[in-house]
Amino acid sequence: MTSKNILNKNNCYDAILVGAGIMSGTLALLITEILPTIKILIIEKLNKPGSESTGAFNNAGTGHAANCELNYTPVDENGDLQIDKALFINRSFENSMSLWASLYSKGKIDIKKFLKFIPHISFVTGTENISFLKKRFKAMSKYPEFADMEFSSSFNQIKSWAPLITTCRDPLDKVAATRIKRGTDINFQALTREYLTYISKNKNVEIFYNTELIDLKKTDKKQWKLKVRSLGKIVSLNTSYVFLGAGGKTINFLQKSKIPEAKIYGGFPVSGKWLICEEKSLTEKHNAKVYGKADIGSPPMSVPHLDTRWIEGKKFLLYGPFAGFTTKFLKKGSYLDLFSSIKKSNLFSMLDVGIKNNELINYLFSQSFKSHNSRVENLRNMMPSAEPSNWYLENAGQRVQIIKKTKDGGSLQFGTEIVNSGDGSLSALLGASPGASTAVSIMIEVLKKSCLFNADKFELEKKLSNLLYESEIKNESDNNFLEIIKKRNNSILGFHP
């Protein structure tokens, strides 16, 4: 990774992106591809890219496509299964696949560095959960996004799909699973490196590490003035556009911007931990990502899953995440992060959320103090043969869920949200899941609402479409469009059904 060593005072840029994770990396790549003359600066507090929320051990990183995540298909109060979110996430992830295919076909990134195909499985036990999974399968498999989904309640069939979840399990247990072979494991940290390595070849792109945003404010000239600390020196920078993609810390920076749109937001930090296994005799037996159902009362990000992961060329098994609570907004943040985010404008909504979600807070604290054996016992619900000696505990990344002011007080939201200034000169990304997997769709939306997109919008839209789908695919409204895209992506990325 290359970047200049000296950040000069009063440098002017067309766009400054705060944070060198997957979001900023994706946005910077989109800008350089369709607006190559735009002068971009990316600043990162740490000494390398993708080290916080994007880090391989810090995020779910499963290549979310809503294939197996049961929390994306909730049952409403009338007992009806809601699949709209799953369809949206799947289509968004296909956009990510399309971009990677386009870039790879042109030799701009190397998919072998970050992408592997691996089946995605949903696994449940008990009559009620099996009924839910069968209902989910029937509803989803009608759509082309999930037409390849398989369902089985056969113990032996499930054993052939994922032997570790059946070893030491009673063959008479009531079990069921769905499988989609076209799942992925994505190392978003490695992908971010690929993006930044490629765009750094553009003379209009600068990337600075060990550079921290201190403050930002709007000037009389309709520009943003940023104060940053770079290698121990305080430097002022000017730009027409700012993107805040600093993970959990984004809420603090958004508040410093003082845009009116920021006043309704607060943050609720949630930490996480993984059980990790490197034992080759186990990692070689599990080639799938298996998602279960969350415990009643647990937050959506705590849906248990047993994942095959490839990180820096090595195969791991990860189980979790186990939730926890800390006042930090970043893994390498400050314990004062939460307190510094409390303002007059969000105090009432944050207190209201705290009162309404007392059970959740108690759950997070109880999870924080679980013993190793207790966590392994939890793992045994999915992998009955698990032994404590084969697993060790590691901290996962930090998440800051959105607290949003409402007419009734405050609402705690699990998801992502884009905040834009009225004039399009500043954008910020708040929240967490599904996050990285839908980065391409999210950043396209950010770009379209930014002041950078004020030129010939028709021409820019055309460039974006060509970037994702190649010029030979003309009609996005065609009924066979998704089928055409998936076939093209499979061919380029190397998935063979």
From Swiss-Prot:
Major enzyme class: oxidoreductase
Keyword Flavoprotein (UniProt): yes
Transmembrane segment boundaries: none
One family name in Pfam for this protein: Mqo
Encoding gene per record: mqo
GO BP, one annotated term: tricarboxylic acid cycle
Cofactor: FAD
Species of origin: Prochlorococcus marinus subsp. pastoris (strain CCMP1986 / NIES-2087 / MED4)
EC number: 1.1.5.4
PANTHER family reported for this sequence: L-2-HYDROXYGLUTARATE DEHYDROGENASE, MITOCHONDRIAL
Keywords recorded for this protein, A-Z: FAD, Flavoprotein, Oxidoreductase, Tricarboxylic acid cycle
Gene Ontology MF term list: 2-hydroxyglutarate dehydrogenase activity; L-malate dehydrogenase (quinone) activity
Protein name, as recorded: Probable malate:quinone oxidoreductase
Protein family: Belongs to the MQO family.
Pathway: Carbohydrate metabolism; tricarboxylic acid cycle; oxaloacetate from (S)-malate (quinone route): step 1/1
Keyword Flavoprotein: yes
Disulfide bonds: none
Reaction(s) catalysed by this chain's protein: (S)-malate + a quinone = a quinol + oxaloacetate
